[in-house]
Amino acid sequence: MSMFEDLPVNVGIIYEGERIRGRDMQVELGGPREEHKFELVRSISLDEIVDGKVTVIGKDLSELPVGTNSPFGIIISVAGKELETDLEGVIERRLHEYVNFVEGFMHLNQRYDIHLRLNKKSYEKGLNSFKVLGEILMRLYKSEMSFIEKIQVTFITDPEKVKEEYEQAIKIYEHRDSRARGMNDSDVDVFYGCSLCQSFAPTHLCVITPQRYANCGAISWFDGRATSKVDPKGPVFEIPVGECIDENTGEYVGVNKVIREKSLGEIERVQLYTAFGYPHTSCGCFEGCAFYIPELKGYGVLTRSYRGETVNGLDFVTLSDMTAGGRQVDGFHGISIEYMRSPRFLQADGGWERVVWMPKLIKERITGFAPQEMLDKIPTEDDVSNLDDLKVYLKEKDHPIVHTWTEEPESQKEITVPQLELPAELLPIQGLPSGMGFTIILKNAKIKAEKLIIKSNRGK
């Protein structure tokens, strides 16, 4: 049953997690094809808002050609006597949840990476104007966040206006992110958990600390504190830290307890500052990811905005598939830009001394936070294009990773795998003569067996 019977499409939690494929798409808003897209919540005074007003700047949904994509911005202005500026980021993040409540609407990512799709069926049912979406969002916000007394929504598809407001939004995001810098995890006895993405990754939970932003890059420790106070039963909540098991890896008794509960026992331990062992899980909304390059014993890092291939031939979509889903996969680690600015970034793995490649856009955004002497030794896509060139570059720059190469990198070595023989008794096979024995040989085994040979051992 829909939450709002007077609207042309259903609205409810049942639609959260719905995926819309290209062939079913009426229109795409933002996404990887568009340079400029954003979502922003601003807290302003009560007398500045016309409560319930929805404004469209540019083409409305009915004016956008079928199957096309458009630059997109959404600005939500809120006001209330109890509304703090600290709540802006969390109210903003709720857009991910609320848009996905709408039948036939898909919302992915956050901030300047948003990606929305509307399907044809919902459009034909009457969701053919941003006015309808705006009405839904305003009702959801007011019904779940009682501290919002007034709200108005502005949708933007005009390319020039999107670009103008996008540039302002970037400045606001940066101001928010700067608040927690200088704080240490050891300064607090409470972290925060965020389960907003569990509709897409049921076993995932973000652990937010002063030195580890949410993977999406949209929720800081201060944001978590503010929202848990006004909405204690909501998707952002306190995590009592408890005893520190290992300060280097970032493992805590309290975090493990909550992770086990929220993942229904699927994830038992999490270490916040390593990509191996028990790494922090990821949904698909992370700003970027760190990926291990075994040939060089180091990490590459990239963000969603990078369009090309990495130095080992993978792209963001491929790496995202390997990283996301609420799993713990050694060597694949969902991260935010702000976490890359943290002194605890991949701390247990060697930090920036283990990073061997990144796009130049990331290098620009973390300059002034990561050690400059290391940034000077880490190449970008402008410097190298394959692993052989990367190896040469690292040697020329005397990158610290070079001193860990006690022998040739793995790709240069001939790997020999001993034959594995299993007795036939361990492999009962129906339909074969009794008394026949077999030898099972796995040749060139790595992760998968290249060849399976079954030999008869008659007479032995």
Predicted feature locations:
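Cysteine-centered metal-binding/redox modules
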Residues: 1-414
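Compositionally biased, non-globular sequence tracts
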Residues: 412-460
